């Protein structure tokens, strides 16, 4: 193996660099090349970068003593590579660098002596050595090929037949090769020289026709060198085949430095693609070579990404001896390109090639190709295609005769086989070709090539060879000029006597000179040669320039004239006779001056182009000056705008600072005002206790409720946890970034820890929560606090640690110090693993060998009754996931017992319980009143209801409570205080433990005795699924004390299971990434957060919402419409595509460039508190193409305040709800957003956020309606129909009222409070979220972010799982003990119907609606006579009772000041009239329970024809609404995606004219009413949280309509009828599961009573028959 030899060569300054007075930034000393950064101060460390190569050639100044010539470069590199080729190795030399760096000069050189490049010199030296060493035993043969790779297309430069692009293929034996690439045999250097010359001509013709440049294409010249040595003794001939690849790469430059545009830019992109791929290959090979150990999976090298690297695959890291010459520029203006070239060359040094001698390659290759051809023939025969035999190959070009049948199912396989067969036959035919045949084919191709040149008009010599640099002595001629100097003066066209026509090959008259390309006509022009005078005759519409002037009329050409034909063909005209005459007419001195004058400017392609621009009136210097002036003016203008914008921002920030300063001063004044009070101004503590006014007359139940509420809110710490997460996120990101950069393999992430039985805190973290571990003033046991910690995942050692936030900050200081010292460490520094084991590295901590699997708990209350129990308890980890099960036996050891243990381990111990041990460290999780602070999702009152139920004696069965074993007052005789008691704990088996753990053992102890633990022996975990048998017996003797008896009653024993990982230290098992039960939906946050209001330019940033008490809440339905201007001049709502799968549940389909308006309609129940006064502002902003948005977008200029039209109150016939509508003109172009100005691209959705600031009466602030809208913009004339077939066939888009989007909002009214109090300011504190703040090295984290609010929800679910597991374990123990004691002797077992009712109740209890829907009031009545005697009431008594009831209700609502103006009736009159419908507001169990039912009237109270002869009482006078200031809050409700029930119902609304069929959807806690199934817009909303659902026999008998139930809100009532009998229960269960369960339970009891009566009668009759038979 050998590495790639790399040489660097620097060229002299060119004219461009000299004109710009560039400085040399390259220095070479020996093999070291140094480059100086001109943009960095010279004395800094980054100013000079040094690189070491195999060779460094200084070719900058020929006057220097160390100047490197072409010969020196060849002797160092060319001769060595040529020797490798004679040794039988493959050889490759390629030049790399930017355009104009000297690559072509190094590889090809010039025609002058001592200026030849590597390619000509290596070819000349090759034949010199061949002629010197060739003998009869040793013969040589040389073949060459010349190809060009331009824009990933391969062209053959030696064979004119191959006009198209050649195909690059890959053969399993040959590797990548170019199909049909001609290989021509050569016998001497002159043959190679002629082929190179003719190849360059073909390259010139193609480049001129296609307007290409050779510097933008790759040229690959390949020499196939074969040595045949004949051994006379053995009469065997051996071969060595070498392939010499000489590559001239295209220039590597950046688009901005070359000024490339249009086609040139695309060409550069394609060329840079191949060069970029070459760079990737070099980098990948260098990385592979630098690795110490290879991975099992082969490293991927992207050879196939470009044709260049695919063809050079063997030369890059394969079977080849390779050399790279990096050509660089010395000028400072090319610093970036030069540095990039040096870095590529430095990477190429590390590439290792595995070159082998290619001996006898053809014989083996021919044999393997024959085998492959035979396999392909067999495959084609199997497909039914006849193929010719091997002896017929010479008669046919392909081996396929004709297919015997048409294309079958395996057509693709057949075509592939035919293609492979043809390619293999071509290869074997090429390999079997003799040397004489190759020479003959080479001669044929030469003749074809010369004929093609002659046909094109290119001059040829008398022997047929094309004229190269040869200049005729008599005949006028044209010589080509090319942008690439190497391709200039390669083509010569004779102008014969008479007429010489020039055009394309498509002309009707054959043209003498044929050109092709753009702007060349079929008959372009004619040259007339009369008496050595050449006249150019242009044809019509032909583009011709002579000396820069466009030619319209015939003109006589003078020698040296520049002729431009079309746009790309540039020539120089030369007339030898005319030049000779001019020299004879003038004197010698004048001739010398003329010659000097002619020689002064070099007539080349650049000269012709500049001349063309000048003659056309384009002054390059003036144009450049003008462009510079424009750039300078643009710079000044942009700088002025930037300064103006900066000044505006400065003023804005200064205004903010002044406002904050003013706020701070006001707060300080307020605090100083409070501090000015003296202690005498406040009430003394003894005054409060002595003054009767301060005494509270609470009952015991009220004091318990107050203590429960106090503890709940005392430990409610969601906000403080979030503040800790937000404030320390930046430290976590910095630690992770440093860990990645230092390759520590340690990850940091936030976690929440709570000190519970299953998850005790580590000692260092437990100290931080010690102050909370004490009883409060109500005597409650201590409760653990949840704290934020850092989970440290050590993937290197397979360990997990927990750090406090303080420890993270301390370790972070050490990490920063290590990061800064990393650059000073040498590569020979010891491995960090040593430091991680010794604790010297701040990233690592010491870790134990055994890891915790989980914990289990066993209660000991069975020892109070000396009975043994065998428990099967779950092994639970700290996350609340079950990791296995443990079987444990607990039994008392009495004096008369004596058990012999044959197997297992038996141990004894003695413990002493002190009186201090009676108080447990942990407060049990099943004490729900305190743990509920973690698992309470919102302010639900379920715990309060439980407490009330317990207080009233209905929560727990009295019989079960009295029979509970734990309620035993006195222990048995075996537990006498002062005596000793012995009990036995037997650890039997463990099951279900994962296979990742080995050597499992169990350790158990009492909760307060961690230092006195009992341990079993480790057991091997075979992972076969069999139980792990411990069989460990532990006898424990304890002196009986009161604390020990109390412990037996209330506390368990803790069992810890340990094990170590099988695959240590891989961390994939250490993380315990197993599938756990997901949390319920109610524990999760909404999927897409609702956007915050867009900041109003008029109101500015709104203050924080007040924390005062909510006085009233109202449900508001809002409709959003975007209207577009129709041809009739009206604004018509645009089409809306409705779908629950869309983020906004609706998509507006808009047209581009049409005037729009936004229309918003607000619908709600009429109430005195909510009266819309006016619309103040409508703001639209946050234009984006993702559903998520951020408040930072409010700072952009996209926020726009729309022009408003006056709002109006609508009067909808048949609907007495309040409708308020307003519109605003929306000119979307003012946002200056490309998303709104152009037509949306395919699959693109645009999102905006709008906020409407509305003014309400009696409100100090505006109410804000905020909504996210999604839209797609089509063309102006496009049809905006629905995009899905479902909406297309439903036809709902044709309904104009369906083209709106609805939103459900909750309007909360709070009392305006003073914001200056310290308590309010403390509650309004805001902690900056630092998770988005940038830290150094953040880009290495690949988008990782610290966890935030979701972590709190996940921890809630973990605590709830732990709570459930402990409750289940405790209850299982009690049930097992009851069964063991024989207490479960219930004579009436639970029936199937009762079980169904229990299941219904359980399911309802876990649903969110259970938390918010109050049950219908139940009145437990055992004897109706004891409450109210049966009697009939007259009309006056009934009216009096109704009046008292309403007064009581008014007094109840009077507590909420916003509702004290409630009218006598809770509903408003309707315009359509009222139906005679009443429903019961108090549910009754049966008609026999209550003879009199108080009814709520759903119709208007002033209606004369009241039902049942009742007379409506006179309406009470409406009190005047006092002027109060409220603070409104409008919050959008994220409707649940879960549909509990949907279908058609008959709906009778109060005040309605009759029954109407409506489509009803239940999404708890809301019921949505639609007009029909196809109606996508919600027309009405019912909030089940504030409604009562009634379904009773009294109601059915009253309305005399079957299958009905009612939903009554505080504003109106609905009577609903299902379409079938069986649907009533399903609808009730969807709306109120608890009510459905009660009804089903009631029906079940009724069905059981007749059955029990029948059974008793049968038993009585059978007993009577038995008695009579005995008698």
Swiss-Prot record:
One of its GO terms (molecular function) is ATP binding. Pfam families: DUF3694, FHA, KIF1B, Kinesin, Kinesin_assoc, PH. Residues 395-413 have a biased composition (Polar residues). InterPro entries: FHA_dom, Kinesin-like, Kinesin-like_KIF1-typ, Kinesin_assoc, Kinesin_motor_CS, Kinesin_motor_dom, Kinesin_motor_dom_sf, P-loop_NTPase. Residues 358-437, 577-674 form a coiled coil. ATP binds at residues 97-104. GO terms for cellular component: cytoplasm; microtubule; microtubule associated complex. Residues 500-566 form the FHA domain. It is found in: Cytoplasm, Cytoskeleton. Its main location: cytoplasm. Residues 3-351 form the Kinesin motor domain. Transmembrane segments: none annotated. Residues 1538-1636 form the PH domain. Residues 391-413, 949-973 are annotated as: Disordered. Keywords: ATP-binding, Coiled coil, Cytoplasm, Cytoskeleton, Microtubule, Motor protein, Nucleotide-binding. PANTHER family: KINESIN-LIKE PROTEIN KIF1C ISOFORM X1 (PTHR47117:SF9), STAR-RELATED LIPID TRANSFER PROTEIN 9 (PTHR47117). Required for presynaptic maturation, has a role in axonal transport of dense-core vesicles carrying synaptic vesicle precursors, components required for the morphological transformation of axonal growth cones to mature boutons. Belongs to the TRAFAC class myosin-kinesin ATPase superfamily. Kinesin family. Unc-104 subfamily. Monomer. This is Kinesin-like protein unc-104. The lineage of its organism: Eukaryota, Metazoa, Ecdysozoa, Arthropoda, Hexapoda.
């Amino acid at each position: 193996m050998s590495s790639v030899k790399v040489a660097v060569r620097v060229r002299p300054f060119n004219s461009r660099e000299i004109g710009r007075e560039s400085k040399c930034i390259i220095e070479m000393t020996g093999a070291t090349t140094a480059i100086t950064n001109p943009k960095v101060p010279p004395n800094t460390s980054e100013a000079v970068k040094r690189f070491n190569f195999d060779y460094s050639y200084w070719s900058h100044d020929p006057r220097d003593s160390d100047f490197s010539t072409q010969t020196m470069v060849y002797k160092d590199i060319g001769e060595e590579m040529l020797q490798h080729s004679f040794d039988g190795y493959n050889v490759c030399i390629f030049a790399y660098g930017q355009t104009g760096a000297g690559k072509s000069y190094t590889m090809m050189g010039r025609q002058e002596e001592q200026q030849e490049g590597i390619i000509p010199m290596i070819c000349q030296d090759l034949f010199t050595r061949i002629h010197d060493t060739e003998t009869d035993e040793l013969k040589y043969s040389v073949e060459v090929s010349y190809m060009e790779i331009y824009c990933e297309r391969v062209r053959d430069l030696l064979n004119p037949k191959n006009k198209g692009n050649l195909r690059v293929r890959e053969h399993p034996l040959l590797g990548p090769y170019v199909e049909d690439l001609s290989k021509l045999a050569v016998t001497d250097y002159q043959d190679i020289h002629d082929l190179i010359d003719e190849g360059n001509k073909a390259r010139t013709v193609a480049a001129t026709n296609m307007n290409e440049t050779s510097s933008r294409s790759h040229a690959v010249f390949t020499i196939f060198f074969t040595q045949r040595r004949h051994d006379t003794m053995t009469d065997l001939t051996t071969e060595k085949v070498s392939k010499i690849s000489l590559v001239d790469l295209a220039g590597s430059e950046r688009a901005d430095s070359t000024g490339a545009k249009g086609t040139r830019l695309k060409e550069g992109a394609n060329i840079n693609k191949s060069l970029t791929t070459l760079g990737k290959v070099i980098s990948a090979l260098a990385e592979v070579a630098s690795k110490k150990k290879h991975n099992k999976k082969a490293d991927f090298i992207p050879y196939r990404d470009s044709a260049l690297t695919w063809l050079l695959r063997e030369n890059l890291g394969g079977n080849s001896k390779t050399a790279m010459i990096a050509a660089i520029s010395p000028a400072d203006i090319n610093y970036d390109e030069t540095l990039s070239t040096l870095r590529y060359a430095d990477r190429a040094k590390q590439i290792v090639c595995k070159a082998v001698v290619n001996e006898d390659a053809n014989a083996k290759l021919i044999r393997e190709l024959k085998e492959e051809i035979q396999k392909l023939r067999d495959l084609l025969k199997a497909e039914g295609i006849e193929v010719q035999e091997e002896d017929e190959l010479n008669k046919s070009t392909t081996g396929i005769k004709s297919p015997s049948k048409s294309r079958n199912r395996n057509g693709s396989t057949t075509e592939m086989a035919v293609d492979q067969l043809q390619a293999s036959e071509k290869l074997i035919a090429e390999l079997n070709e003799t040397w004489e045949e190759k020479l003959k084919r080479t001669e044929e191709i030469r003749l074809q090539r010369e004929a093609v040149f002659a046909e094109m008009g290119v001059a040829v010599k008398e022997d047929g060879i094309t004229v190269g640099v040869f200049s005729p002595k008599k005949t006028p001629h044209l010589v080509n000029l090319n942008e690439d100097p190497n391709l200039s003066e390669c083509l010569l066209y004779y102008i014969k006597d008479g007429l010489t026509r020039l055009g394309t090959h498509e002309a009707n008259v054959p043209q003498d000179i044929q050109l092709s390309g753009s702007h060349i006509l079929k008959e372009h022009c004619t040259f007339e040669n009369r008496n050595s005078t050449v006249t150019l005759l242009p044809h019509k519409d032909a583009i011709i320039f002579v000396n820069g002037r466009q030619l319209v009329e015939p003109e006589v050409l003078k020698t040296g004239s520049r002729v431009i034909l079309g746009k790309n063909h540039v020539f120089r005209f030369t007339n030898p006779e005319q030049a000779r005459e001019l020299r004879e007419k003038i004197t010698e001195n004048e001739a010398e001056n003329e010659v000097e004058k002619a020689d002064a400017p070099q007539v080349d392609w650049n000269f012709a182009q500049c001349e063309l621009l000048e003659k056309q009136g384009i002054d390059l210097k003036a144009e450049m000056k003008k462009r510079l002036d424009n750039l300078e003016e643009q710079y000044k203008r942009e700088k002025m705008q930037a300064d103006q914008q900066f000044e505006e921002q400065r003023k804005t920030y200064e205004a903010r600072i002044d406002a904050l300063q003013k706020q701070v001063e006001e707060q300080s004044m307020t605090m100083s005002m409070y501090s000015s009070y003296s202690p005498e101004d406040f009430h003394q503590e003894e005054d409060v206790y002595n003054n009767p006014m301060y005494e509270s007359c609470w009952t015991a139940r009220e004091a318990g409720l107050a203590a429960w509420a106090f503890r709940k809110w005392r430990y409610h710490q969601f906000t403080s946890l979030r503040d800790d997460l937000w404030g320390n996120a930046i430290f976590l990101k910095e630690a992770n970034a440093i860990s990645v950069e230092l390759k520590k393999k340690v990850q940091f992430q936030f976690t929440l820890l709570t000190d519970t039985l299953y998850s005790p805190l580590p000692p260092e973290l437990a100290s931080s929560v010690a102050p909370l571990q004490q009883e409060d003033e109500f005597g409650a046991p201590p409760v653990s606090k949840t704290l934020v910690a850092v989970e440290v995942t050590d993937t290197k050692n397979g360990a997990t640690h927990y750090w406090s936030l303080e420890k993270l900050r301390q370790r972070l200081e050490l990490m920063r110090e290590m990061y800064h010292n990393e650059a000073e460490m040498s590569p020979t520094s010891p491995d960090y693993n040593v430091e991680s084991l010794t604790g010297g590295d701040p990233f690592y901590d010491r870790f134990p060998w055994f890891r915790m699997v989980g914990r289990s708990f066993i209660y000991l209350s069975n020892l109070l009754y000396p009975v043994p129990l065998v428990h099967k308890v779950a092994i639970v980890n700290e996350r609340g996931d079950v990791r296995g099960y443990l079987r444990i036996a607990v039994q008392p050891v009495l004096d008369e017992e004596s058990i012999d243990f044959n197997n297992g381990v038996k141990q004894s111990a003695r413990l002493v319980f002190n009186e201090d041990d009676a108080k447990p460290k942990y407060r049990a999780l099943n004490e729900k009143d305190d743990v509920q602070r973690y698992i309470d999702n919102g302010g639900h009152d379920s715990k309060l209801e439980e407490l009330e139920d317990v207080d009233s004696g209905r929560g727990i069965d009295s019989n079960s409570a009295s029979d509970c074993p734990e309620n035993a007052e006195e222990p048995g005789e075996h537990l006498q205080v002062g005596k000793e008691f012995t009990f036995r704990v037997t650890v039997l088996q463990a099951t279900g433990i994962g296979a990742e753990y080995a050597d499992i053992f169990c350790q158990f102890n009492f909760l307060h005795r961690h230092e006195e633990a009992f341990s079993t022996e480790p057991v091997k975990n075979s992972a076969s699924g069999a139980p792990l048998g411990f069989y460990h017996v532990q006898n424990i003797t304890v002196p009986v004390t009161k604390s020990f008896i109390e412990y037996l009653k209330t506390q368990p024993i803790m069992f810890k299971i340990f094990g170590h990982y099988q695959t240590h230290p891989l961390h994939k098992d250490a993380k315990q990434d197993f599938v756990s039960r997901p949390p319920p939906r109610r524990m999760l946050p909404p999927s897409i957060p609702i956007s915050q209001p867009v900041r109003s330019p008029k109101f500015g940033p709104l203050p924080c919402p007040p924390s005062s008490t909510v006085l009233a809440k109202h449900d508001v339905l809002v409709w959003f419409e975007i209207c577009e201007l129709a041809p009739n001049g009206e604004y018509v709502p645009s089409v809306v595509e409705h779908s629950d799968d869309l983020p906004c549940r609706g998509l507006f389909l808009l047209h581009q460039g049409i005037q729009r308006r936004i229309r918003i309609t607000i619908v709600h129940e009429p109430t005195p508190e909510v009266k819309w006064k006016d619309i103040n502002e409508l703001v639209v902003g946050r234009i984006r193409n993702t559903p998520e948005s951020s408040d930072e977008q409010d700072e952009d200029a996209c926020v726009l305040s729309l022009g408003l039209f006056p709002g109006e109150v609508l009067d909808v016939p048949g609907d007495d709800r309040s409708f308020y509508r307003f519109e605003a003109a929306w000119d979307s172009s003012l946002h200056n957003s490309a998303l709104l100005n152009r037509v949306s691209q395919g699959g693109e959705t645009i999102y905006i956020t709008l906020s409407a600031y509305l003014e309400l009466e009696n409100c100090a602030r505006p109410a804000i309606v905020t909504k996210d809208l999604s839209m797609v913009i089509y063309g102006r004339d496009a049809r905006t129909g629905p995009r899905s077939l479902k909406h297309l066939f439903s036809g709902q888009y044709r309904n104009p009222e369906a083209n709106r989007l609805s939103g459900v909002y909750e309007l909360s009214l709070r009392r305006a409070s003073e914001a200056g109090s310290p308590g309010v300011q403390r509650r309004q504190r805001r902690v900056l979220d630092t998770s988005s703040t940038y830290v150094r090295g953040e880009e290495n984290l690949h988008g990782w972010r610290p966890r935030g609010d979701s972590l709190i929800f996940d921890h809630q679910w973990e605590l709830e799982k732990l709570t459930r597991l402990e409750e289940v374990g405790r209850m299982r123990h009690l049930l097992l003990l009851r069964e063991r004691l024989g207490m479960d002797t219930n004579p009436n077992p639970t029936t199937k119907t009762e079980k169904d009712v229990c299941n219904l109740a359980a399911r309802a209890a876990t649903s969110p609606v259970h938390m918010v829907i109050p049950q219908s009031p139940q009145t437990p009545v055992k004897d109706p006579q004891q409450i109210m005697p049966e009697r009939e009431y007259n009309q006056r008594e009934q009216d009096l009772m109704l009046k008292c009831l309403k007064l009581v209700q008014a007094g109840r609502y009077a507590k909420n000041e916003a509702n004290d103006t409630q009218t006598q009736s809770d509903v408003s009159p309707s315009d359509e009239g009222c139906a005679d419908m009443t429903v019961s507001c108090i549910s009754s169990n049966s008609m026999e329970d209550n003879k009199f039912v108080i009814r709520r009237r759903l119709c208007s109270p002033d209606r004369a024809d009241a039902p049942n002869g009742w007379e409506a009482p006179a309406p009470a006078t409406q009190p005047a609404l006092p002027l109060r200031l409220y603070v409104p809050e409008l919050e959008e409700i994220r409707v649940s995606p879960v549909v509990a029930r949907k279908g058609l119902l008959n709906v009778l609304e109060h005040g309605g004219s009759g029954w109407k069929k409506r489509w009803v959807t239940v999404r708890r806690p809301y019921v949505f009413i639609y007009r029909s199934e196809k109606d996508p817009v919600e027309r009405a909303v019912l909030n089940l949280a504030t409604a009562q659902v009634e379904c009773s026999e009294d109601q059915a008998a009253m309305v005399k309509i079957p299958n009905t139930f009612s939903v009554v809100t505080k504003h109106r009532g609905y009577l609903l009828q299902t379409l079938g009998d069986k649907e009533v229960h399903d609808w009730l269960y969807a709306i109120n599961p608890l009510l459905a369960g009660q009804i089903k339970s009631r029906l079940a009891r009724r069905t059981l009573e007749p059955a029990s009566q029948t059974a008793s009668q049968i038993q009585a009759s059978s007993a009577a028959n038995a008695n009579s038979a005995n008698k």
